[in-house]
């Protein structure tokens, strides 16, 4: 890379989620959350997609989220390591069920809030800017089993109470917030963001669209509350973005690619950024067999959306995808996040995710051109099988190569004109995978001695990438060697 395009004040850091690292699932008066009933292992998605899935803990399975990496008892050690790397920011989430154990209480659990007081203060002690996701795949289980999850409009009020509580408490300590993690991911696995699976309504697409609407309105309420509490707060949306290519120049594939982008990348973003439903909404719903009249909404809710768009766009980027509707029996990717036709020009990770740094540059340009808002890459990284030596050292050049190429792509996108706020690679410390419930799928700069069954010393060890990323931050992205 010939020039360093990263602006002064660029937010370098790392990202995690409460349910994937905290553990202590029954400590501090915490209630059960959705991830507490999701079994571990590669069969996780298959099990929870079953029509018989009952949202209960089954003793025949293991539940890695119960333990996480025990960050609940190690957070000071972990944040000290982040500070040693030079983090300017740290993205994490507040577990809803730690603050409101059932989700529908009027008053919060003070013990849960005191934990986050300590986490935030520890970050500020090292001049690390907290970046908080209000809801990250960890809604209270009670809201699913008793209220039917986000199809029920009552959840807007429960979320509003949760958001108001944390936004008020941390109004002078936390500037950057996001409303819902990867809200558009419900198009692929609605259980994680909406609490819906085949056993409780995900088979009917109108439930997904109704849940989205209710989440959009709840998110707009959070934006309104945050700006009223502290006008300097920056509250963003957070989406999963996959750059999408047409297989060829056949107009049918080109049209399918456009519609794929509308459905997967743009719909949820359009509503939250522009403050209104896009012109293609009726057509999009129709493709899923849903009528506008199926959705319960009113003018007051639409007005709330219009008056409270987000301040920035946070997004995850892991891969690109290829759309082909004109050929049968095409080789497909075996990734567990999204399907699609295999791209012969790209390599793939150990989990079949196609590696495409140029796709990140394209994503930043597409989002910048469409929305003209600041962009924050809050997830990106390589999930890999790390093999430590006898001294627990991981020589992860493969991870360094992945990150280097993606950081170069960000720099090039900034040169193209994209307004990029920061970069927080996912799983900066090894944690439990959301999609598979495994520890063996590792992203971190820090190795945690723990296996897929939750056994180990839980000791932390620096990987080779730890010192490399420290150098990247020290030079504000100038030295990627």
Set out the residue ranges of the language-model regions.
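Active-site region of glycoside hydrolase catalytic domains
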Residues: 1-53, 58-59, 102-104, 113-481
């Amino acid at each position: 890379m010939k020039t360093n395009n990263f602006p002064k004040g660029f937010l370098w850091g790392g990202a995690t989620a409460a349910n994937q690292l905290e553990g202590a699932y029954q400590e501090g008066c915490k209630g059960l959350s959705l991830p507490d009933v999701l079994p571990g292992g590669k069969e996780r998605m298959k099990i929870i997609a079953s029509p018989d899935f009952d949202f209960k803990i089954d003793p025949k399975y293991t539940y890695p989220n119960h333990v996480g990496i025990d960050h609940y008892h190690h957070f000071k050690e972990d944040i000290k390591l982040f500070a040693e790397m030079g983090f300017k920011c740290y993205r994490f989430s507040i577990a809803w069920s730690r603050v409101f154990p059932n989700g529908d209480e009027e008053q919060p659990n003070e013990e849960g809030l005191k934990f986050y007081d300590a986490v935030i203060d520890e970050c500020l002690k090292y001049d690390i800017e907290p970046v908080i996701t209000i809801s990250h795949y960890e809604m209270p289980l009670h809201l699913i089993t008793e209220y039917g999850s986000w199809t029920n409009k009552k959840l807007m009020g429960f979320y509003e109470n949760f958001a108001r509580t944390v936004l008020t408490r941390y109004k002078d300590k936390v500037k950057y917030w996001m409303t819902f993690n990867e809200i558009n991911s419900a198009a692929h696995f609605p259980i994680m963001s909406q609490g819906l699976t085949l056993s409780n309504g995900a088979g009917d697409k109108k439930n997904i669209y109704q849940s989205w609407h209710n989440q959009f309105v709840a998110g707009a309420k959070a934006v309104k509350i945050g700006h009223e509490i502290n006008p300097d707060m920056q509250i963003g949306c957070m989406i999963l973005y996959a750059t999408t290519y047409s297989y060829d120049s056949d107009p049918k594939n080109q049209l399918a690619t456009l519609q794929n982008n509308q459905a997967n990348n743009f719909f949820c973003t359009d509503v939250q950024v522009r403050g209104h439903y896009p012109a293609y909404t009726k057509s999009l719903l129709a493709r899923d067999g849903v009528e506008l009249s199926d959705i319960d909404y009113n003018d007051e809710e639409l007005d709330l959306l219009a008056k409270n768009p987000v301040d920035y766009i946070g997004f995850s980027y892991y891969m690109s995808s290829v759309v082909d509707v004109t050929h049968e029996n095409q080789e497909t990717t075996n990734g567990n996040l999204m399907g699609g036709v295999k791209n012969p020009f790209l390599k793939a990770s150990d989990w079949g995710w196609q590696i495409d740094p140029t796709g990140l540059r394209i994503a930043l340009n597409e989002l910048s051109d469409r929305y003209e808002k600041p962009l924050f890459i809050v997830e990106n990284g390589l999930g890999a099988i790390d093999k430590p030596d006898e001294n627990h050292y991981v020589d992860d050049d493969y991870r360094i190569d992945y990150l280097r190429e993606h950081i170069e792509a960000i720099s090039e996108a900034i040169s193209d004109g994209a307004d990029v706020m920061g970069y927080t690679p996912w799983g900066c410390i090894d944690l439990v995978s959301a999609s598979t419930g495994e520890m063996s799928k590792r992203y971190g700069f820090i190795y945690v001695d723990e296996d897929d069954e939750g056994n180990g010393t839980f000791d932390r060890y620096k990987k080779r990438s730890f010192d490399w990323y420290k150098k990247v931050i020290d030079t504000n992205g100038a030295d990627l060697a």
